[in-house]
Amino acid sequence: MRKVHEHIIQIPPFVTRDQLWNGLEKAARHPDRFVEHMEGCELLSERLIEGARHLGREVSFGGGFRLRDKVILREGESVTTVVEAGESWPASTFLMKIEEPEAGSLFVRFIYEADEPEEALNPMIEQLRRQA
């Protein structure tokens, strides 16, 4: 996997870690409310494995495009989305990780990785990654 994009955002000081986590979990369960061009998300499975919650989802985009992914929620810490390669897209991962370098100073780091050479990047897929 090759890192495609990474950025970090600072969270306003009035937002607590619990509130931030609740927002990240909501985004994992209902990404269609947050990602432009995503039309729906169906939760197919949910299991607890080694202390992390694993979700199986099917997400749909315009034009009838659908894909299945896996989401790993590590309570209060991170959300990782794993997409297996399909006919028209590469395998990829998307990590949202809470960082707190000092008490009350919250950040979320976003890391996008894909199994594709840089010259093969699909502009539409890249735009969706940057919006997530």
Per-region residue spans from a language model:
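Hydrophobic ligand-binding cavity/cleft-lining segments
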Residues: M1-I49
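Short solvent-exposed loop/turn micro-motifs enriched in small/polar/acidic residues
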Residues: R2, F34, G63-F65, W89-A91
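Intrinsic-disorder/low-complexity, polar/charged segments enriched in Ser/Thr/Lys/Arg/Asp/Glu/Gln
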Residues: R2-E6, H54-G56, S105-F107
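Hydrophobic/aromatic beta-strand elements that line small-molecule binding cavities or substrate pockets
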Residues: H7-I9, C41-L44, L67-I72, A91-E100
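Beta-strand elements of well-folded, non-transmembrane domains
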Residues: P13, F61-F65, Y112-E116
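Short, surface-exposed loop and linker segments with low hydrophobicity and enrichment for Pro/Ser/Thr
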Residues: F14, D18, G51, K97-S105
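Glycine-rich portal/gate segments that line the openings of hydrophobic small-molecule binding cavities
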Residues: L43-E87
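Beta-strand/loop substructures that line and gate deep hydrophobic ligand-binding cavities in soluble
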Residues: V82-A132
